[in-house]
């Protein structure tokens, strides 16, 4: 734990000091992903978070999370210059409209230097519709998503986890977070293997929480590799802490933002 350190929080500050995140997430079939990713971004310390999504999604979660700002997808796309970090893909869906929208977002962000986290359906779309990623991108695939991104079999990835992570970082010119029991974080020069976590994290929605945590750390001006490394640690350690009270069987993804502060306090 001594190797991990949270970003500094100056007392002479305001919400803008700790970054503005725009989260393109959710569709009517995957409403929960937008909530989990957004609340996690706030819980790790981002100063301002906006969710750009469909009307059904916003209607469902806006009363659950009044701290966030809510925009339509189109409003989000028009206002990218107001934000410092972007999270794309959690529950976005893979229908034609989502595919077109994903391409439009990336084309817009290629003009920017702000960090971008791509997760879940964003990765599924990227695998089928390759497009150059913006500078300072982080991708967060599980092994099956990694296999699609690399054009290989799932077994190939499982048999070669470290080399697969390196290949992802090289192919997409990004930081790759290959999510496994011992998640691998790497870029073109560095590789780190996380040693925390348990089966409590093997639940739907857990990856949305991780993506949100990483985006929130980026908002506080952490470099991409360090934000990914710390985000993976906090996520996995939170799973361990929550399991002590709830058991590995009963921890839900929605429990992770609730227990996140305990993992943070351990390294302050």
Question: What is the role of each PLM region?
Answer:
Residues 1-117, 124-138, 147-268:
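Small-residue (G/A/S/T)-rich helix-start motifs and N-terminal tracts that mark the onset
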């Amino acid at each position: 734990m001594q190797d991990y350190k949270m970003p500094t929080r100056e007392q002479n500050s305001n919400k803008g000091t700790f970054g503005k995140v725009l989260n393109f997430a959710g569709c009517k079939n995957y409403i929960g992903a937008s909530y989990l990713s957004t609340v996690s971004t706030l819980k790790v310390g981002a100063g301002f978070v906006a969710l750009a999504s469909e009307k059904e999604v916003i209607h469902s979660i806006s009363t659950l999370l009044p701290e966030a700002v809510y925009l339509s997808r189109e409003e989000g796309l028009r206002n990218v210059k107001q934000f410092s970090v972007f999270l794309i893909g959690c529950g976005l869906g893979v229908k034609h409209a989502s595919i077109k929208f994903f391409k439009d977002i990336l084309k817009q962000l290629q003009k920017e230097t702000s960090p971008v986290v791509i997760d879940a359906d964003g990765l599924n779309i990227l695998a089928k519709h390759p497009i150059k990623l913006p500078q300072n991108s982080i991708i967060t695939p599980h092994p099956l998503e990694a296999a699609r991104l690399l054009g290989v079999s799932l077994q190939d990835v499982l048999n070669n986890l470290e080399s697969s992570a390196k290949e992802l970082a090289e192919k997409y010119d990004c930081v790759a977070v290959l999510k496994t029991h011992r998640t691998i974080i790497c870029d073109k020069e560095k590789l780190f293997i996380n040693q925390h976590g348990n089966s409590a994290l093997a639940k739907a929605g857990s990856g949305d929480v991780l993506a949100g945590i990483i985006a929130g750390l980026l908002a506080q001006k952490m470099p991409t590799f360090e934000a990914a490394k710390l985000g993976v640690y906090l996520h996995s350690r939170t799973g361990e802490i929550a399991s002590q009270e709830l058991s590995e069987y009963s921890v839900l993804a929605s429990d992770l933002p609730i227990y996140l502060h305990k993992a943070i306090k351990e390294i302050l």
